[in-house]
């Protein structure tokens, strides 16, 4: 039996064929959108997920940080499991680079967060508190996939607290 380690992009090791493909891949400067391989990958991902476009990021750490910084502003907070990469690992990037405050809570043995606890941690709309802006769920935790019904309930909870303030509308 062959062991495949999917814990992290940091433990991925390309085999000979992958290294060979990399050595002959057509490359260019992605800043100028001159890298046909990256363009093809982004186009393929956008089509696969039914989106207008996609963005290639070379690591899970960078992807998680971009997601946090996309959804949160300086001084905001995100609710996250204590074992999640965006909290426990990744050098505290959200706090260090984005001035985003994590609000960690215990994860259940199946990787879920108790949604009652999540709801109790959502801060009131009061300038004395960091604004609760995001619920981060890690899929998978300890190799366990979050159940679809749980994700639906978590999504419903998050959406029920979504609102746009007048300044937010004007900054869009």
Spans of features found by a protein language model:
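Conserved N-terminal alpha-helix of the aminotransferase class I/II PLP-enzyme fold
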Residues: 15-60, 82-83, 87-88
């Amino acid at each position: 039996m062959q062991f495949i380690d999917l814990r992290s992009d940091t433990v991925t090791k390309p085999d000979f064929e992958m290294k060979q493909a990399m050595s002959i891949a057509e490359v260019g400067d992605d800043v100028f959108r001159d890298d046909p391989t990256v363009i093809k990958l982004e186009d393929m991902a956008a089509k696969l997920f039914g989106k207008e476009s996609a963005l290639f990021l070379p690591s899970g750490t960078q992807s998680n940080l971009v997601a946090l910084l996309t959804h949160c502003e300086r001084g905001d907070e995100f609710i996250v499991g204590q074992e999640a990469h965006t909290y426990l690992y990744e050098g505290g990037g959200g706090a260090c680079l984005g001035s985003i405050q994590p609000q960690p809570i215990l994860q259940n043995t199946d990787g879920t967060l108790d949604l009652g606890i999540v709801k109790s941690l959502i801060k009131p709309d009061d300038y004395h508190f960091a604004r609760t802006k995001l619920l981060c769920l890690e899929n998978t935790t300890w190799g366990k996939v979050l159940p679809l019904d749980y994700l639906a309930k978590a999504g419903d909870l998050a959406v029920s607290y979504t609102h746009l303030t007048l300044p937010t509308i004007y900054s869009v």
